Amino acid sequence: MGKLIVVGSCGVLVCVLASLYTIGNLLNEIEELQVEFQDGMVEFRAITQDTWARMVSKHINPTGHTNAPPTFETLFGARTARQAGFEQCNCGPKSEGCPAGPPGPPGEGGQKGNPGHDGDDGKPGAPGVIVAITHDIPGGCIKCPPGRPGPKGPSGLPGSAGPAGGNGRRGPPGPVGGPGEQGPQGDAGRPGAAGRPGPAGPRGEPGTEYKPGQPGRPGPQGPRGETGPAGNPGAPGNDGEAGKNGNAGRPGPPGHPGKNGVPGQKGEDAAPGPDAGYCPCPSRAAYKA
């Protein structure tokens, strides 16, 4: 989960940086276009003013430029055609305020004038601008060879995702992978059924025969055992020696006479016990006494 967050954050950061770079390039291009447009407007105004001045000069000086050399007609006036017959002096009063008459017939061809002086050098033209008005421009537009290609522009925005392509061909089978890591120990299975008894094994080698050794020393005395159950009442003991006469007691109340009991049977002799290693056993005569 943490890796996905880091990868997503890096992707968003890259997109933001790319957007800022693209916006900066667009603003730079817009500023360059604005400067070029202003320069083009200045050059266009200069061309229109120059063209307008030339058009006006054509109406004011129809013979040519204002600095053109004078001609025969401008110095001596146009020659009038001679009337047929005889010359007549026009001494009558001149008309005043009369409308102009119809144009006369074209006159005879004049003499060839002297070659004029070389004209002044023209003004330098606008650098590299397409002239929209070509009226009265000698030779028209100058066709210049194409210039060098400009610098490479910035990369465009990434296009939209194209349609999904078809399924490719099935590739060859990959190599066999190595053995994976050992998995965790599985749960214990159910105990299986008892198997058949196996065949009898081979006969073993004869064992080593040992002779009984000498009896060992008696061990130390063990701890005292727990108290055993109460034994059967023993045989009546021998009469003891007569004791000293006691003090006369207070006479007690007379008791009820008891019944005589039945004498018990004589018990069987017990089996002799094991000999102990720490003390000699007493003789049987002591018990019979």
Curated annotation (Swiss-Prot):
A GO CC term assigned to this protein in UniProt: alae of collagen and cuticulin-based cuticle extracellular matrix
Family recorded in the similarity comment: Belongs to the cuticular collagen family.
Gene: col-19
TM region positions: none
The organism's place on the tree of life at top rank: Eukaryota
Subunit text: Collagen polypeptide chains are complexed within the cuticle by disulfide bonds and other types of covalent cross-links.
Residues of the signal peptide: 1-18
Any one Gene Ontology molecular-function term assigned to this protein's record: structural constituent of cuticle
Stretches assigned to coiled coil: none
Role this protein plays: Nematode cuticles are composed largely of collagen-like proteins. The cuticle functions both as an exoskeleton and as a barrier to protect the worm from its environment.
Organism of provenance: Caenorhabditis elegans
Region (Triple-helical region) residue spans: 101-130, 147-269
Keywords noted in UniProt: Collagen, Cuticle, Disulfide bond, Repeat, Signal
Composition skew (Low complexity), residue ranges: 184-207, 223-239
Designated name of the protein: Cuticle collagen 19
